[in-house]
């Protein structure tokens, strides 16, 4: 009897682990069939694992400032990607003007899975569209 309980608990734990990994690597929080583009000023840039994070202030349709956030792949992948500018921890700084395009959050929050970033000089830093 106790071996069946132990086996059941082990199976349940394995299923939970698979669900967590799938949820983390899935794009469930974003809408892959939609794209949005916003333009604004970098407020924070975090070149950290597991995902590089970009935060910016964008002027909304009503003229009010909106804080947007977005995520990219890992720093290692960005630094080694031959299709993109070589990324490093100071490629973006607070005050930089950028335009980002990506898949928006399903819940309407001002965040996205970033596909493309263009800096204020028109340099494409990444384009995974």
Predicted regions, residues:
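OB-fold/S1-family single-stranded nucleic acid-binding modules
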Residues: 103-128
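Short nucleic-acid-contacting surface segments enriched for D/E, G, S/T with interspersed K/R
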Residues: 81-99
């Amino acid at each position: 009897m106790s071996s069946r309980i132990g086996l059941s608990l082990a199976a349940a734990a394995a299923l939970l682990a698979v669900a967590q990994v799938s949820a983390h690597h899935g794009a469930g929080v974003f809408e892959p069939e939609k794209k949005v583009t916003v333009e604004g000023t970098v407020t924070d840039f975090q070149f950290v694992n597991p995902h590089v994070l970009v935060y910016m202030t964008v002027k909304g349709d009503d003229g009010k400032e909106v804080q947007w956030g977005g995520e990219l792949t890992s720093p290692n992948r960005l630094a080694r990607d031959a299709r993109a500018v070589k990324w490093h921890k100071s490629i973006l700084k607070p005050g930089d003007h950028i335009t980002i395009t990506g898949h928006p959050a399903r819940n309407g929050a001002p965040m996205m899975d970033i596909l493309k970033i263009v800096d204020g000089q028109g340099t494409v830093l990444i384009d995974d569209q």
